[in-house]
Amino acid sequence: MRILWIVAVCLIGVEGNLFQFAKMINGKLGAFSVWNYISYGCYCGWGGQGTPKDATDRCCFVHDCCYGRVRGCNPKLAIYAYSFKKGNIVCGKNNGCLRDICECDRVAANCFHQNQNTYNKNYKFLSSSRCRQTSEQC
């Protein structure tokens, strides 16, 4: 019960893009799927280093690179327009950086969906000591 309360408090404080990204992931993969990607491999979650462990981890690497190219707003906080149409994520009428962030998130959510078969439970909560190789360039 205490853990549920902590999770609820954390989610109440989540605004903007990261919450929208989570909703995209859940929309493509099913309710609560986002929890599978919060700390996975070397790149899913905060930060990232080393070589992606599999195609799922590479989705996060590419997403990190995409966020790194966004200029003009904070990708983790900005709120953009999007919707689901027939199971597809459609970015709305966003301008500039909001459009770019939405596209980063849309591509990553689709990538997770397309690479579900590579998901390896052994990479969930992977120790950072297993991600010490030289990081790839974006």
UniProtKB/Swiss-Prot annotation:
Catalytic activity entry: a 1,2-diacyl-sn-glycero-3-phosphocholine + H2O = a 1-acyl-sn-glycero-3-phosphocholine + a fatty acid + H(+)
GO cellular component terms listed in the entry, alphabetical order: extracellular region
Biological process per Gene Ontology, one example term: phospholipid metabolic process
Signal peptide: 1-16
Compartments, record wording: Secreted
Pfam families reported for this sequence: Phospholip_A2_1
Tissues of expression: Expressed by the venom gland.
Cofactor: Ca(2+)
Gene3D superfamilies: Phospholipase A2 domain
Manner of cofactor binding, per the entry note: Binds 1 Ca(2+) ion.
Catalytic residue list: 63, 105
Regulation: Enzymatic activity and neurotoxicity are inhibited by Triton X-100, which has been determined to be located in the center of the hydrophobic channel of the enzyme.
Disulfide-bonded cysteines: 42-131, 44-60, 59-111, 65-138, 66-104, 73-97, 91-102
Tagged with keyword Cytoplasm: no
Residue numbers binding Ca(2+): 43, 45, 47, 64
A GO MF label: toxin activity
SUPFAM superfamilies: Phospholipase A2, PLA2
Sorted UniProt keywords: Blood coagulation cascade inhibiting toxin, Disulfide bond, Hemostasis impairing toxin, Hydrolase, Metal-binding, Neurotoxin, Platelet aggregation inhibiting toxin, Presynaptic neurotoxin, Secreted, Signal, Toxin
UniProt EC number: 3.1.1.4
Keyword Hydrolase found: yes
InterPro entries, alphabetized: PLipase_A2 (IPR001211), PLipase_A2_Asp_AS (IPR033112), PLipase_A2_dom (IPR016090), PLipase_A2_dom_sf (IPR036444), PLipase_A2_His_AS (IPR033113)
Similarity annotation: Belongs to the phospholipase A2 family. Group II subfamily. D49 sub-subfamily.
Subunit annotation: Heterodimer; non-covalently linked. The toxic basic protein has phospholipase A2 activity (chain HDP-1P) and the non-toxic acidic protein functions as its inhibitor (chain HPD-1I (AC A4VBF0)).
Entry function: Heterodimer: shows the same activities as the monomer, but with a lower potency. Monomer: snake venom phospholipase A2 (PLA2) that shows presynaptic neurotoxicity, anticoagulant activity and that weakly inhibits ADP-induced platelet aggregation. Inhibits exocytosis in pancreatic beta cells, confirming it can act presynaptically in inhibiting the exocytosis of neurotransmitters in neurons. PLA2 catalyzes the calcium-dependent hydrolysis of the 2-acyl groups in 3-sn-phosphoglycerides.
Protein name, UniProt field: Basic phospholipase A2 chain HDP-1P
